[in-house]
């Protein structure tokens, strides 16, 4: 199917994908006086006396801001705030469809870190959570870090953490299938940007001890001068053997390849140099680092991509609806690392041992069990950690 043409027609026909819908009817004078003036003054007074009452009397508790500056949109790059709108609308649509979370796109006409932080802080009283989206690295790290420190609502950069959570969920099951342990496998992550770094961090929390990050210029190593601050910090805690060189060398002998990089950078011959029962997660979109049939030709046993037309789709839609549903229902002040681990385990657990096979290591995007399971795990974790207010 020609999805480009169909998408253009959809967006033109509907003038976007989302709209504001009323929860109550205003059909007569009494309705008007209750929904607006004079009756509306009473909830205003209650909230003025106790700001936490805003969760009781307004939509804040189920409302998420989808914030972008349009600098890292899909594979399109820095296309600006207006051109980012269809993606942010799409994100809001998925929030609603998969977890009944109301979300609103906010595309900012600035690339300045301080301006973005200040703007989101000004908007925060309206929202129960903030989903950062398609903001380029390394600025995205500072923006998220500061907002998490300065706001008392969940802030979540989905390009980092959503990707990391679903990768970890898939890898937990893939390793179970091939009979290998997280602490023992050798992992190469191609793409040392926001997603690759976040994947590495979460894998380490799951016990991974042997990770090498690779970027365009080669392995991320403490001896390299080209590293940005985020990459340099990762060099200190990964690549313990101080491997150097291009991906073609680094991939040799590895048990796991995780790609969040560019199309067609891996060949069947490269996969053939990996360890036996190799696991290949090639997630570049729309064209992966290696097509599944080529990875299989190279000897990979478990293969996943970011595409819906192949088995084992590694898709963030398995994560962000449920993680925000749980955080909002708990009225959490933040999304902690432990909540991310809980989300990954919940996704992995959807696939039972009896169901687990090479072409089914992760639930499908439309599996209705996923969002509720993630939400419950996240909510339970928030309460156990003392970051819940509900």
Question: What are the roles of these predicted feature ranges?
Answer:
Residues 74, 81-99, 157, 161, ...:
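Glycine-rich phosphate/diphosphate-binding loop of Rossmann-like nucleotide-binding domains
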Residues 12, 55-60, 96-97, 122-124, ...:
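Solvent-exposed alpha-helices and their adjacent loops that cap or buttress functional pockets
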Residues 105, 131-134, 155-158, 189, ...:
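General beta-strand structural signal in soluble alpha/beta enzymes
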Residues 158-159, 181, 282-390:
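Adenosine-phosphate binding glycine-rich loop
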Residues 232-301, 307-309:
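Rossmann-like adenosine-cofactor binding region
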Residues 1-155, 375, 381, 385-389:
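N-terminal ligand-binding/catalytic initiation module
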Residues 69-71, 79, 108-109, 134-137, ...:
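Short, ordered loop/turn segments at secondary-structure junctions
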């Amino acid at each position: 199917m020609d999805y480009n043409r169909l998408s253009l027609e959809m967006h033109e026909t509907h003038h976007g994908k989302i709209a504001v819908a009323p929860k109550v009817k205003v059909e007569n004078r009494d309705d008007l006086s209750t929904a607006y003036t004079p009756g509306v003054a009473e909830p205003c007074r209650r909230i003025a006396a106790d700001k936490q009452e805003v969760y009781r009397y307004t939509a804040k508790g189920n409302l998420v801001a989808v914030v972008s500056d349009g600098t890292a949109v899909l594979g399109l790059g820095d296309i600006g705030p207006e051109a980012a709108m269809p993606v942010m609308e799409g994100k809001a649509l998925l929030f609603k469809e998969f977890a009944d979370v109301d979300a609103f796109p906010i595309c900012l006409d600035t690339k300045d870190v301080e301006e973005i932080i200040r703007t989101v802080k000004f908007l925060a009283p309206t929202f129960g959570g903030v989903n950062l989206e398609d903001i380029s690295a390394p600025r995205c790290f500072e923006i998220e870090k500061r907002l998490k420190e300065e706001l008392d609502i969940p802030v979540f950069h989905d390009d980092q953490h959503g990707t990391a959570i679903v990768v970890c969920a898939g890898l937990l099951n893939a390793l179970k299938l091939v009979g290998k342990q997280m602490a023992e496998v050798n992992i190469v992550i191609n793409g040392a940007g926001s997603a690759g770094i976040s994947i590495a961090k979460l894998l380490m929390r799951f016990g991974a001890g042997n990770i090498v990050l690779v970027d365009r210029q080669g392995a991320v190593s403490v001896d390299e001068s080209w590293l940005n601050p985020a990459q340099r910090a990762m060099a200190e805690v990964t690549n313990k053997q101080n491997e150097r060189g291009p991906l073609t060398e680094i991939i040799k002998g590895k048990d796991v390849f995780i790609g969040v990089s560019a199309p067609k950078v891996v060949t069947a011959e490269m996969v053939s140099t990996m360890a036996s029962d190799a696991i290949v997660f090639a997630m570049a979109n729309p064209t992966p680092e290696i097509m599944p049939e080529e990875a299989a030709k190279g000897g990979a046993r478990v293969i996943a991509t970011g595409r819906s037309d192949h088995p084992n789709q590694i898709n963030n839609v398995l994560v962000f609806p449920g993680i925000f549903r749980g955080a909002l229902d708990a009225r959490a002040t933040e999304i902690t690392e432990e909540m991310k681990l809980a989300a990954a385990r919940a996704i992995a657990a959807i696939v039972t041992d009896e169901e687990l096979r090479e072409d089914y290591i992760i639930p499908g995007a439309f599996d209705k069990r996923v969002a509720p399971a993630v939400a419950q795990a996240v909510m339970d974790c928030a309460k156990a950690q003392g970051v819940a207010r509900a």
